[in-house]
Amino acid sequence: MGVMNTEYQSHLIQEIRQNNYRLERGDVTILLAEAFGFCWGVERAVAMAYETRQHFPGDRLWITNEIIHNPSVNQRLREMEVNFIDVVNGEKDFSGVAKGDVVILPAFGASVEEMQLLNDRECTIVDTTCPWVSKVWNSVEKHKKKEHTSIIHGKYNHEETIATSSFAGTYLIVLNMAEAQKVCDYILHGGDRQEFLDYFANAHSAGFDPDQDLVRLGVANQTTMLKSETEMIGKLFEKTLLQKYGPIELNNHFMSFNTICDATQERQDAMFDLVEEDLSLMVVIGGFNSSNTTHLQEIAVEHGIPSVHIDSGDRIGPGNRVEHKPLGKDLEVLEPWLPAGKITVGVTSGASTPDKVVEEVMKKILAIKEAQPVLEIAG
């Protein structure tokens, strides 16, 4: 953990925490979310990956995917000569992994098929899967034993959901309430079977039949999805099956377990508190492919707060310029992005973002504001 403390923790962040999550410098007030950044599962996974290199200094090391959705952390592993499995035409290529190699499974987990392949090659496996993800796997396995179809709230191409679905029997992945409603409408009223299958083409188990496989359901989720939406989806399916089969038969048709990750929930709750403040803008820090970070940005956008999503302080500058990712769009450049005069900036970060990265972003914001009067005079 010594390396973790040196590389990822921040004295400035500790000071802000102790000052009621508030920092005031000149024209800038920074309000930090009361829950943000590295969660326990991420910290555990990164520490285990580092310790694996120390424990196997001369061995060839692999990791089946990004350890977490943070570019700086993954780059650090590459510098430690941890090899990432190549993806060729959308498929992982394990041909380079030899018998006896050491293979790290990331925080999101790995599919049953990948684990079997690595076992067959007699690899040494270091499993850093977050226990909250394992909890979801246990839930879908219970669905499978009871011959229930798993309705998984998640993104069908996200590593965690790919792994979770591999533990399920029959499954269907829904991205949001709109897709859940589409499924529930089919349960109650039927519809065009082929149209349904085409719509969910990449999001169901092999041989899925909506006329046969939507009778008994269990709900699970990708742990980083928006808590409130997962809860609404669960209630929608319960209400739909209650309407179709009645209260006496409901328990034979519907299973639900709480698989919402505590850390995800805490960060979202803290964000809902933060957006109630009088903010000039919101800065959300985390990997662009990070699901939990994107959901934090959604909360700011839904509350009408101007927000920028960046993955590191390198996106800021030179000058009063930022390269950021608006919700649902590609990278854009915003210049100027910090308004003149007194501003209050809300700051949060995803569960895969180290405190050091948050500190770097804050320091750049402060530097821009300190230089602003000079820039204005020069202009």
UniProtKB/Swiss-Prot annotation:
Binding site for [4Fe-4S] cluster: C39, C130, C261
Cofactor: [4Fe-4S] cluster
Membrane-spanning ranges: none
Pfam families found in the cross-reference section: LYTB (PF02401)
One function term, GO molecular function aspect: 4-hydroxy-3-methylbut-2-enyl diphosphate reductase activity
Pathway membership: Isoprenoid biosynthesis; dimethylallyl diphosphate biosynthesis; dimethylallyl diphosphate from (2E)-4-hydroxy-3-methylbutenyl diphosphate: step 1/1; Isoprenoid biosynthesis; isopentenyl diphosphate biosynthesis via DXP pathway; isopentenyl diphosphate from 1-deoxy-D-xylulose 5-phosphate: step 6/6
Protein keywords: 4Fe-4S, Iron, Iron-sulfur, Isoprene biosynthesis, Metal-binding, Oxidoreductase
Binding site for isopentenyl diphosphate: H69, H158, S290, S291, N292, S352
Keyword hit for Endoplasmic reticulum: no
Catalysed reaction, written as an equation: isopentenyl diphosphate + 2 oxidized [2Fe-2S]-[ferredoxin] + H2O = (2E)-4-hydroxy-3-methylbut-2-enyl diphosphate + 2 reduced [2Fe-2S]-[ferredoxin] + 2 H(+); dimethylallyl diphosphate + 2 oxidized [2Fe-2S]-[ferredoxin] + H2O = (2E)-4-hydroxy-3-methylbut-2-enyl diphosphate + 2 reduced [2Fe-2S]-[ferredoxin] + 2 H(+)
Gene Ontology terms describing biological process: dimethylallyl diphosphate biosynthetic process; isopentenyl diphosphate biosynthetic process, methylerythritol 4-phosphate pathway; terpenoid biosynthetic process
Enzyme class: oxidoreductase
Function: Catalyzes the conversion of 1-hydroxy-2-methyl-2-(E)-butenyl 4-diphosphate (HMBPP) into a mixture of isopentenyl diphosphate (IPP) and dimethylallyl diphosphate (DMAPP). Acts in the terminal step of the DOXP/MEP pathway for isoprenoid precursor biosynthesis.
HAMAP family recorded: IspH
Protein name, per record: 4-hydroxy-3-methylbut-2-enyl diphosphate reductase
Native species: Synechocystis sp. (strain ATCC 27184 / PCC 6803 / Kazusa)
The organism's taxonomic lineage, starting at the top: Bacteria, Bacillati, Cyanobacteriota, Cyanophyceae, Synechococcales
